């Protein structure tokens, strides 16, 4: 028997759960945990709400509430959502609990006393209007890597971890003004010292899936810089140093430790050591947007502390909605609470698993959800079960009939049934959850065909033993389905077992124990029903209605042609170009725009050497408010494409000519 530590990525306590949360993280973790419990492994499945950081502080400011009130509100919603989806957590706690504070501060001190954390003078964005330094998410701007809108700590588009000072066109989230750069200090972790260790971990850990390994390798190629561990703000875990008044631990540092504090709380309540689980097998289930943090930062911290590194990091990919990216701000999302109010949660568990491999991006479509429910659950699995149970009662008084003198077809079908638990178990063990469910569906289809071919409704009049063998084997498959479906759709699996008159199907090995001849089953009830078109149409209409209401509220984001005319774009020619000290992305340019020469700071250093830009014609926004980037005045903006940062090339235009 193995002990297995399984964690779900901590949901951030600034909103309830939607389909994407369940699909990428909590559902696969639950499937894996349930299966391993069924094969008698000792599983500890933990999670917590992540309750510090700037988004909660920002929301609290807007609502004139305390951050802890915001966190508590959404913690309660998240617990409701997770429980409604039957996620079988052993412990679910909060990063605002006293035990978490104790563990996080002790972890910091351990690394600090080892000399792996140091104080460093840095430059940081400061809002002169708000009179405060701006931690990561108090800043929004443009990602210097891919050109998308990004927060001060992370770009959702390309997955890059960022520092606020790296953003192009930074803005204070509170007041909208352009911040300045000021000198301050923070505490840094010597992540660079563990670069070789992390390369070895990524290269030689055969358990890591390809998407995690490839992401991590790409980042490691660029080399690792030391990682800032602290922020200037009130909401967070205070640094346990007298000299660090006003500093708190960066939320990403202490959020990782939520896995440990949740397990430690469980240990205090049960008297069982959580460390035994971690030191045997430790597996993280996360979303792909936080691969960088879990494959680089977290293993680096653990290595520094002296802990065993995670055995596996399973990252679920993104889920879109009706072909479009989910957006909570636009209300283009299906909330878990809304779904379970109208549908059985097992239907969602089935659909999100069978729709696509979890390491591939996929889409949730109401029409496809209806199709899979009706064609697969109702017409195949449900139909097979209902016919089996109904005919058993009709022809054999609800008792498992005698099995003898099997035909070749009987023997073949019996062999398929007996192999099913092993095949599904191997798929789940290998994190191939969809393939396991597809195999169950495939065998259920075979069961329907076998039932049709044997025609027990005719055989009872012509060859009673043929009918008996058919119903015997069909009931054996029904029993097997109760077991192999338990990790996927636990409520329905229990319902199947109840009809068969069995206890809860909790031991995987019992899937192979045949029902005894003469065993009495209960009367059948329909387990899966079809979803009508009008029900689905109502959901689609509701989704569009929510989007329209959100768009109406955000019409202020659109600009008129008159507003656009205010933007003055001219053709400029680069006369001088040089790198900005301490920045690997920024260049300082002197650009002739016809009537004057402007100094412009541009994020082009990774794409162009300074000498390549001399005499190059470029498109320049010339009426932007001047701003300082890395302490250097910028009096305009060079237009370039997003991810490649390729310059627009108006070579045939005259310097100073305005683009209309």
Swiss-Prot record:
EC number in record: 6.1.1.10
At which positions is motif 'HIGH' region?
11-21
The UniProt entry's GO biological process terms, in alphabetical order, are: methionyl-tRNA aminoacylation
Keywords of this entry: Aminoacyl-tRNA synthetase, ATP-binding, Cytoplasm, Ligase, Metal-binding, Nucleotide-binding, Protein biosynthesis, RNA-binding, tRNA-binding, Zinc
State how the cofactor is bound: Binds 1 zinc ion per subunit.
Which molecular function GO terms apply here?
Answer: ATP binding; metal ion binding; methionine-tRNA ligase activity; tRNA binding
Q: Does the keyword Metal-binding apply?
A: yes
Residues binding Zn(2+), per UniProt: 143, 146, 155, 158
Binding residue positions for ATP = 328
Please name the top-level EC class of this enzyme: ligase
Pfam families for this protein: Anticodon_3, tRNA-synt_1g, tRNA_bind
* Required cofactor(s): Zn(2+)
Q: Which reaction does it catalyse?
A: tRNA(Met) + L-methionine + ATP = L-methionyl-tRNA(Met) + AMP + diphosphate
Q: Which domain of life is it from?
A: Archaea
Q: Where is this motif: 'KMSKS' region?
A: 325-329
What InterPro entries does this protein's entry cite? Anticodon_Met, EF_Hand_1_Ca_BS, Met-tRNA-synth_bsu_C, Met-tRNA_ligase_1, Met-tRNA_synth, Methionyl/Leucyl_tRNA_Synth, MetRS_core, MetRS_Zn
Q: Quick one: a GO cellular component term?
A: cytosol
Localization per record? Cytoplasm
Family annotation (HAMAP family): Met_tRNA_synth_type1 (MF_00098)
Its family remark reads:
Belongs to the class-I aminoacyl-tRNA synthetase family. MetG type 1 subfamily.
Function (record text) = Is required not only for elongation of protein synthesis but also for the initiation of all mRNA translation through initiator tRNA(fMet) aminoacylation.
Question: Subunit comment for this entry?
Answer: Homodimer.
Q: Which NCBIfam families match?
A: metG (TIGR00398), metG_C_term (TIGR00399), PRK00133.1 (NF001100)
What is the name of this protein? Methionine--tRNA ligase
* Gene for this chain: metG
């Amino acid at each position: 028997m193995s002990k297995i530590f399984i964690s779900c990525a901590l949901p951030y306590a600034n909103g309830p759960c939607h389909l994407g949360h369940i699909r990428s993280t909590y559902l696969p973790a639950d499937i894996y945990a349930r299966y391993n419990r069924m094969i008698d492994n000792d599983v500890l499945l933990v999670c917590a709400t992540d309750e510090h950081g700037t988004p909660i502080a920002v929301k609290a400011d807007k609502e004139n509430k305390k951050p802890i009130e915001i966190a508590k509100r959404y913690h309660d919603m998240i617990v409701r959502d997770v429980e409604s989806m039957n996620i079988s957590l052993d412990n679910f706690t909060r990063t605002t609990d006293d035990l978490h504070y104790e563990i996080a501060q002790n972890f910091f001190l351990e690394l600090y006393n080892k000399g792996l954390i140091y104080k460093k003078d840095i430059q940081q964005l400061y809002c002169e209007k708000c009179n405060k330094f701006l931690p990561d998410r108090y800043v929004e701007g443009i990602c210097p890597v891919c050109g998308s809108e990004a927060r001060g700590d992370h770009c959702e588009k390309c997955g890059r971890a960022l520092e606020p000072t790296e953003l192009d066109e930074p803005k204070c989230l509170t007041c909208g003004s352009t911040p300045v750069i000021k000198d301050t200090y923070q505490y840094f972790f010597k992540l660079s010292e563990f670069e070789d260790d992390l390369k070895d971990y990524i290269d030689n850990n055969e358990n890591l899936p390809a998407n995690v390994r490839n992401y991590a390798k790409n980042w490691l190629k660029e080399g690792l810089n030391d990682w800032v561990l602290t922020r200037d703000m009130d909401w967070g875990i205070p640094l346990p140093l007298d000299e660090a008044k006003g500093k708190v631990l960066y939320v990403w540092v202490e959020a990782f430790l939520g896995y440990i504090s949740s397990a430690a709380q469980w240990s205090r309540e049960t008297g069982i050591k959580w460390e035994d689980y971690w030191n045997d097998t430790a597996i993280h289930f996360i979303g792909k947007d936080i691969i960088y943090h879990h494959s680089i930062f977290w293993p680096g911290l653990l290595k520094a502390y002296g802990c065993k590194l995670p055995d596996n990091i399973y990252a679920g990919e993104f889920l879109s909605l009706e072909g479009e990216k989910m957006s909570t701000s636009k209300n283009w999302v299906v909330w878990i609470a809304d779904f379970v109010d109208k549908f059985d949660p097992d239907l969602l568990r089935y659909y999100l698993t069978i729709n696509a491999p979890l390491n591939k991006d996929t889409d949730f479509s109401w029409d496809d959800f209806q199709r899979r429910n009706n064609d697969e659950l109702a017409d195949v699995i449900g139909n097979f079960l209902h016919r089996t149970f109904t005919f058993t009662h009709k022809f054999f008084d609800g008792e498992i009939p005698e099995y003898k003198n099997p035909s070749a077809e009987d023997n073949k079908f019996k062999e398929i049934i007996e192999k099913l638990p092993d095949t599904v178990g191997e798929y789940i063990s290998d994190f191939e959850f969809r393939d396991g469910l597809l195999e169950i569906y495939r065998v259920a289809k075979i069961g329907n065909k076998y039932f049709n071919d044997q025609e027990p409704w005719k055989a009872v009049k012509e060859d009673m033993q043929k009918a008996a063998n058919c119903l015997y084997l069909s009931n054996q498959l029904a029993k097997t389905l109760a077991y192999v479906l338990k990790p996927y759709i636990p409520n329905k699996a229990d319902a199947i077992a109840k009809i068969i008159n069995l206890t809860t199907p909790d031991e995987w090995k019992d899937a192979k124990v045949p029902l005894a001849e003469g065993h009495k089953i209960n009367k059948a009830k329909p387990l899966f029903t079809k979803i009508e078109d009008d029900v689905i149409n109502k959901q689609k209409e509701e989704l569009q209605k929510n989007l329209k209401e959100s768009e109406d509220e955000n019409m202020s984001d659109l600009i008129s042609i008159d507003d656009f005319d205010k933007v003055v774009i001219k053709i400029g020619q680069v006369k001088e170009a040089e790198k900005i000290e301490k920045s690997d992305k920024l260049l300082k340019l002197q650009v002739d725009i016809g009537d004057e020469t402007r100094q412009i700071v541009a994020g082009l250093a990774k794409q162009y050497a300074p000498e390549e830009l001399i005499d190059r014609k470029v498109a320049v926004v010339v009426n932007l408010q001047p701003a300082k980037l890395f302490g250097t005045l910028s009096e305009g903006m060079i237009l370039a494409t997003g991810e490649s940062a390729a310059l627009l090339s108006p070579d045939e235009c005259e310097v100073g000519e305005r683009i209309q």
